[in-house]
Amino acid sequence: MTVNTTDRLAALRSLMKERSVDIYVVPSEDSHASEYITDCDARRTFISGFSGSAGTAVVTLDKAALATDGRYFNQASKQLDENWHLLKTGLQDVPTWQEWTADESAGGKTVGIDPTLISPAVAEKLNGDIKKHGGSGLKAVTENLVDLVWGESRPPRPSEPVFLLGAKYAGKGAAEKLTDLRKELEKKKAAAFVVSMLDEIAWLFNLRGNDITYNPVFFSYAIVTKDSATLYVDESKLTDEVKQYLAENGTEIKPYTDLFKDTEVLANAAKSTSESEKPTKYLVSNKASWALKLALGGEKHVDEVRSPIGDAKAIKNETELEGMRKCHIRDGAALIKYFAWLEDQLVNKKAKLNEVEAADQLEKFRSEQSDFVGLSFDTISSTGPNGAIIHYKPERGACSVIDPNAIYLCDSGAQFYDGTTDVTRTLHFGQPTAAEKKSYTLVLKGNIALDTAVFPKGTSGFALDALARQFLWKYGLDYRHGTGHGVGSFLNVHEGPIGIGTRKAYIDVPLAPGNVLSIEPGYYEDGNYGIRIENLAIVREVKTEHQFGDKPYLGFEHITMVPYCRKLIDESLLTQEEKDWLNKSNEEIRKNMAGYFDGDQLTTDWLLRETSPF
């Protein structure tokens, strides 16, 4: 649905003129660099009408541009009104939003941004680019201008309860995690680490919340020094159990709004050191805000680092890994029941079900499983051409009826107390064409190739990406998204710093035993269909005949327990090794589903058919 943004842009431009700003940048993120945000922080969506999770809006006094990546080209072209120009990031000869902004700044123009919504590295590079192109520079505008346009209709900030995640699920206490973090401070000779990422704070203190839909996090900051820890959070959200737990771990509670006041105290303390002493250094994540770096005293006193908390969080302990395995079995049972039910509804009962009605039923089946908390993201329930919109979101009351004679793509996930799931399966309830079967099988071959890969410790996801694409590449085909992302343990479904893809950030982060990430190659034909096959996998050490360079070798243990669509597989394109892999995988699924469908003949028959040997 397209939103008319004419009045909103006019109001924003009026505020820009009042503040001597010629160009205003509106990022997607909140002040914690969250990928998924709460409604009151959806500023880019409000000003542009584009609701995808990634993108940046740039507004001049007479133009407006929205930059997003290949996952959202289709969606953005449908949602943006005539006021906006779409910058298709990654395509040849298309400028990035930074390049477009710098070009527009020529002639001494000032570019403004809310400094809490941009990292120091991006801000500093943008400032340099603006000046190179003849602009006056990047200005920190402390009042968010979109918030002022939004006014009283802006949703309130959530204040959901915060609860303790016990050792049964976390596997490691907050006191031990704080000790490990302090060792990192000592190594880096830093006085404190100011924590701004919400999932890092939740993990560090073994707490969870519900301030951002689908993400069990809560609005907070933290400061950890060698002998103290302070959690900045609205205290009314904390139960007595949480307060006691924090006290036992030596953590002081302060209001969320006190963070910047206390960073000024730290900055003043750092400035008071004598010239003969080494300057006091504070650590922040390389995803922390420009505002936070400025508040701590700027370049002299702040080191931006890949967060040691993020690195530790990405390597799950044995309790977390076992939880991930178990919740994927329960999640698999819900999905298998759903796909059997959906086929029966569409084929046997000739029911007319729309995409949202189907997704609601999947959520119902998931909610029947133990330790279920909620979904981990909006279910992508997509029929036919909607599947080609990579992050499609069916709208209640305005979505398509599922066509049994078209490809159906379902990308969904859940939050359980013992883990987070994310799985995509592509199905056909009628008779697929030879071209559809070929496309599906090429994607499946890529999934198998990556799942069975063995690689030396120290290998990054950047280096592995081509394994999943190679079969598509042989036919001149590809997909415009990463092949894999890290996944949290009852935390965010997208978790850094690891991933599989061509992002430069992945080059410097090797995969390590205990990582959990997705393997999800795909193929999309605009206006026709989308195919994606996604499993979650644990990185683990594997035994090899040799260990060149005395390095251990790693591989994947896939934990998703859902079969692949039998009728979409072209067996003639599979090698015997790939058939053996499928047979082993299907046998494992059957074994893990024992007892889940007793008395449910419909689901049992579907499972036996879809997992029959090749």
Curated annotation (Swiss-Prot):
The biological processes this protein is annotated with in GO are:
proteolysis
List residues binding Mn(2+) 2.
411, 422, 534
Which reaction does this enzyme catalyse, per its entry?
Release of any N-terminal amino acid, including proline, that is linked to proline, even from a dipeptide or tripeptide
The EC number(s) attached to this protein equal 3.4.11.9
Q: How is the cofactor bound?
A: Binds 2 manganese ions per subunit.
The prosthetic group or cofactor this protein requires is: Mn(2+)
InterPro entries, from UniProt?
A: Creatin/AminoP/Spt16_N, Creatinase/aminopeptidase-like, Creatinase_N, Pept_M24, Pept_M24B, Peptidase_M24_C, Peptidase_M24B_aminopep-P_CS, X-Pro_aminopeptidase_P
Q: What class of enzyme is it?
A: hydrolase
SUPFAM superfamilies, sorted: Creatinase/aminopeptidase, Creatinase/prolidase N-terminal domain
- Name the domain of life this protein comes from: Eukaryota
- Output one GO MF annotation: metalloaminopeptidase activity
- A GO CC term assigned to this protein in UniProt: cytoplasm
Keywords from the named record: Aminopeptidase, Hydrolase, Manganese, Metal-binding, Metalloprotease, Protease
Residues where Mn(2+) 1 binds: 422, 520, 534
Q: Which PANTHER family match?
A: XAA-PRO AMINOPEPTIDASE 1
What protein family does this chain belong to? Answer: Belongs to the peptidase M24B family.
**Function recorded in the entry:** Catalyzes the removal of a penultimate prolyl residue from the N-termini of peptides.
Its protein name is: Probable Xaa-Pro aminopeptidase P
Q: Organism classification, top ranks?
A: Eukaryota, Fungi, Dikarya, Ascomycota, Pezizomycotina
- Which gene underlies this protein? AMPP
